[in-house]
Amino acid sequence: AEKKGINMSRIMRSFYAHADSAFSFGVIEAALDDYKRDLGSFDARIQMRSAFPMQMTSLRSGLAGWQYYDIALELVDRAGVRTRILHLDYVYSSTCPCSLELSEHARATRGQLATPHSQRSVARLSVVVTGDLWVEDMVDLARKAVVTETQVMVKREDEQAFAELNAANPIFVEDAARLFCEALRADPRIGDFRVVASHQESLHS
């Protein structure tokens, strides 16, 4: 109660001491230790964001490119207990199952070509890490749960493959959320978790 404020430069010095280290929970823990020692804090929380690159091969042509995932590593130190939290934004395409059925109905009954509407979709997956889990593992879990991830390198044959993949896996937002939850719940390296899925509307105003 007797403290009146904080010197922001002291906070930054705690972080800059680890500027040359690789981005990891271990480095964040070391920075948090310095922060608590330098400022005499009992509880603390730190979150660091980054764009994490992973090489991705196209669906059919075999081209390779870099997919950048928005991630955040969060460390919470409260009452002597530390919690590691990993956040991942997974971007995918979602074809509306209802729209797909209507398109097929138009083709079958009237010979009319129709296009089902698809949305650019994002799932924010936040997990409490209790085992040996890293970003690549989270991406692999997300890809297996919902396979229609947006692509990096695309030729005509890749675009066709992506269209086929979307048609074979139409999905509502609530179903996507359930699939992500099932994948996270089944992994022993994950404690608590939260899934926020958003299918960005392409039909309604």
Please give the residue ranges for each predicted region.
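N-terminal intrinsically disordered, cationic/polar leader segments
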Residues: A1-S205
